[in-house]
Amino acid sequence: MVSTLPIAYTSELGVLGKKKIELQTNGIIVPPDLVEDLEKNWNAPAIRRGRFVICLESQDDKKLTTVLIINGKFAVNSPYHMIKNGSNYEIWKNDAKYTDIVLMPHPKFYEKVTRDGVPMYEVAVLGEPNHLRSVLNQRCAHHVCGKPCKFCAIENWWAGHPNKTPAQIAETAEAAYQEGIIHHVTLSTGTKASPGKGLEDIVESARLISRKIPVSTTVNFEPMTDYVLLESLLREAKESGATTALCNIECFDSNIREVIMPVKGKLAIDVYDKVWERCLNIFGENEVYTMIITGIGETDESILKGVEFAASRGVVASVVPHTPMIGATYEAMIPPSTERMLYLFEAALPIYEKYGLKLYGGTGGIYTSLKGM
């Protein structure tokens, strides 16, 4: 059903949105001396693995757009590089300044350890301002059986503790909250060989967090066909402070789904539809999200039809560029062009408007950047 809610999007993505995608699809070269500086003084715990977060500040309202940079092999040819100019940090394109950037300070909790001796920076990290993120299990069952999703390198995301416990997650979240730097938590996991595929641990983590601190939580999980178990776990998550659900389909193109996702791709799109329906029944409108990856062999038509399919159900489908990670099967691929991404964004925005969806509306903190996608 088409919504009549008064939601409107500009057809113009804005300067920051365009800069964001330009930097993501090219990568940013960071010289060795700045790698050490960022790791020590700023929020960059995974920079030696090519992953770090910068922010672009609006000159109009000073709001920040978060940019996740993944420097895969493709980034060695990037025209963009970071420099330090006095106390400020800048991105230059070749020999000319491109933009100022804002970095998040190095959190104090990164220097702490959990009660069982695990460094907290190995348990959870700041993914953007006010937002803590953790991946409970970084040993995905699909990787273990030799059938990983070809775009994924979950084991290399950051030097995290490979199998984090809910107690460690809750303790780390409490430390970050007491520092005054988080309002949201996103919990995800590599697939586990369990009935709930790891969602059980996410729910337990949310439950323990809710006992300690008042934050909103996003649960990010793999779909399952045991819908009775799914509903039970999601309702428990909701009761434990989870406000937003993220179940990523990654690709709508039926011609390549099983090629790029040998296990996940066997799940029919109809399964995702049924999972999203249950998420919507529990979490409500504008609280259910999915992600579509661009640049893994799919067609533009499949992406835009996928955005429409999801939106017609009440699900926000975020279109993101494939920035190939080192360690993934597809690590040697090249990201999609900036022009292609901008075209897809421009084409997707009216679809969200048509169905009254808020691209950045999840109260769990997911996609809280106000410009760009």
Question: Across the structure, where does each feature detected by a protein language model lie?
Answer:
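Catalytic cores of alpha/beta
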Residues: V228-E239, T294-S312, L370-K371
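Short loop/turn motifs at secondary-structure junctions
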Residues: P148, I181, G241, G284, ...
